[in-house]
């Protein structure tokens, strides 16, 4: 499994958590029955668990940049994509350009026609306001 596939799995797990509120350990267990994450296991677990631990903070950032979109009106898959990407940039030491590009590609694959532009715009505004540059990450 490569990092792109692992990131898709993270988004799927965050989506599953949002719609089911199953314990994250159960969600991880169910996904691992499907496919062995191999070298990406640490990234997957750190990102899923970290995004859930920081869910309130991440959701405040999403609300701040969503231009009058309430979280409960957004497609759940878009929320999962945004949560993954913001977590990566804020806490996961992932370069901004990689995280945004991957988020947009995942949106093209799994979400609505308008979602890639929405996600790109929201994440771009987040990066500008956080003072992150292309290729950088926040080293929290």
Swiss-Prot record:
What NCBIfam families has UniProt attached to this entry? Answer: nusB
Indicate whether RNA-binding appears among the record's keywords.
yes
* Gene behind the chain: nusB
Q: Which HAMAP family match?
A: NusB
- Originating organism: Thermoanaerobacter pseudethanolicus (strain ATCC 33223 / 39E)
Under Pfam families, the record lists: NusB
Query: Under the GO molecular function aspect, what terms does this record hold?
Result: RNA binding
User: Could you tell me which SUPFAM superfamilies the record lists for this protein?
Assistant: NusB-like
Output the lineage of the source organism: Bacteria, Bacillati, Bacillota, Clostridia, Thermoanaerobacterales
Write out the function statement from the record: Involved in transcription antitermination. Required for transcription of ribosomal RNA (rRNA) genes. Binds specifically to the boxA antiterminator sequence of the ribosomal RNA (rrn) operons.
Q: Which domain of life, per UniProt? A: Bacteria
Q: A Gene Ontology biological process annotation?
A: transcription antitermination
Record-linked InterPro entries: NusB-like_sf, NusB_fam, NusB_RsmB_TIM44
Q: Which UniProt keywords apply?
A: RNA-binding, Transcription, Transcription antitermination, Transcription regulation
Entry GO terms, CC: cytosol
Record's PANTHER family?
ANTITERMINATION NUSB DOMAIN-CONTAINING PROTEIN, N UTILIZATION SUBSTANCE PROTEIN B-RELATED
Report the family membership.
Belongs to the NusB family.
Task: Provide the protein name.
Answer: Transcription antitermination protein NusB
